[in-house]
């Protein structure tokens, strides 16, 4: 199912959406934070999807618990370290971990730049102990408005040499991309690549804006592109990568079930699309789960799965020499 000769990657993976249940429990008790359960077993349903619950509101509540326990920078560093460990344990050769420093900082008024530094330190510590390659993507969380995003941007750009890209995430309908044109001009001026969550809650116009104005060369989710033939042609012609997260799309009710997920439409059209986990801690999945469901629920062949795997490597924000090294390590 997973082709061992091709590097296994996960490019759309939120570091702040992957906090272990055990870690939430321990940090909550360590810092006197009231948790919604009296035992570790009882806590799991509050922070992880159980079974087939598909509700955006429920999903976001679970996500919020993951940052509610980040009471100090040591907690941030621990979560970053464990993200590297989890990536390695799930068999990934390469992952891009993205994080929103304001979202991680806001519950306990942590310094935004301090959060960025703690994430970098935790990832570096993790890389010393685990055989996986990691790059970092900074997120501006649009839901908190332009000013908070500017604070995030400044904290992230202070360490731009430790990042490969910047992302725009959050409430796509309430805070359209046009509000962040100036923010992304600074990102482009800093020489960072750009990805953006778009075409998930909003339509294809959100994707056009992200690509043509913000400068995105990859799009997170992008499920609504299939309703715009001109956009589909553009995606193929310009090799705009689509970071697909099927299980997450189900859990957030972006799609009703795997049968109607547009992954196959994208692949058949020749769009550069790959599989990702999104918030693996909340969805309670790993990358192998995504390949399994695409095969079992969506009927993809092993050849199609291998194409998705190759696409992921091609889309990665890395140099051609690093890409070749990833393949060489699989030989």
UniProtKB/Swiss-Prot annotation:
InterPro entries: A_deaminase, A_deaminase_dom, Ado/ade_deaminase, Metal_Hydrolase. Its cofactor is Zn(2+). One of its GO terms (molecular function) is 2'-deoxyadenosine deaminase activity. It comes from the Bacteria. Binds 1 zinc ion per subunit. SUPFAM superfamilies: Metallo-dependent hydrolases. Catalyzes the hydrolytic deamination of adenosine and 2-deoxyadenosine. This is Adenosine deaminase. It comes from Shewanella denitrificans (strain OS217 / ATCC BAA-1090 / DSM 15013).
């Amino acid at each position: 199912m997973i082709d061992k000769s091709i590097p296994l990657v996960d490019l759309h993976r939120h570091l702040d959406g992957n906090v272990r249940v055990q870690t939430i429990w321990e940090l909550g008790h360590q810092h006197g934070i009231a948790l919604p359960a009296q035992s570790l077993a009882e806590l799991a349903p509050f922070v992880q999807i159980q079974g087939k619950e598909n509700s955006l509101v429920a999903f976001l509540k679970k996500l919020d618990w993951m940052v509610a326990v980040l009471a100090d920078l040591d907690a941030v560093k621990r979560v970053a370290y464990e993200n590297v460990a989890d990536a390695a344990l799930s068999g990934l050769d390469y992952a891009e971990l993205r994080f929103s420093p304001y979202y991680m900082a806001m519950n306990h008024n942590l310094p935004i730049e301090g959060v960025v530094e703690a994430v970098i330190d935790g990832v570096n510590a993790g890389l010393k102990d685990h055989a996986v390659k990691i790059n970092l993507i900074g997120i501006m969380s649009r839901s908190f408005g332009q000013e908070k995003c500017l604070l995030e941007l400044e904290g992230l750009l202070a360490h731009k040499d430790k990042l490969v890209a910047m992302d725009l995430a959050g409430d796509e309908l309430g805070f359209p991309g046009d509000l962040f044109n100036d923010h992304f001009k600074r990102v482009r001026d800093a020489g960072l690549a750009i990805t953006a969550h778009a075409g998930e809650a909003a339509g294809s116009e959100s994707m056009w804006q992200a690509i043509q104005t913000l400068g995105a060369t990859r799009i997170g989710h992008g499920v609504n592109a299939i309703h715009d033939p001109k956009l589909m042609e553009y995606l193929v012609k310009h090799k705009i990568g689509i970071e697909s997260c099927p299980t997450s799309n189900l859990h957030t009710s972006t799609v009703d079930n795997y049968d109607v997920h547009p992954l196959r439409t994208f692949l058949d059209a020749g769009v550069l699309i790959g599989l990702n986990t999104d918030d693996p801690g909340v969805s309670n999945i790993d990358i192998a789960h995504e390949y399994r469901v695409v095969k079992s629920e969506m009927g993809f062949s092993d050849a199609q799965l291998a194409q998705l795997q190759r696409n992921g490597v091609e889309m990665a924000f890395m140099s051609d020499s690093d890409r070749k090294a990833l393949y060489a390590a699989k030989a």
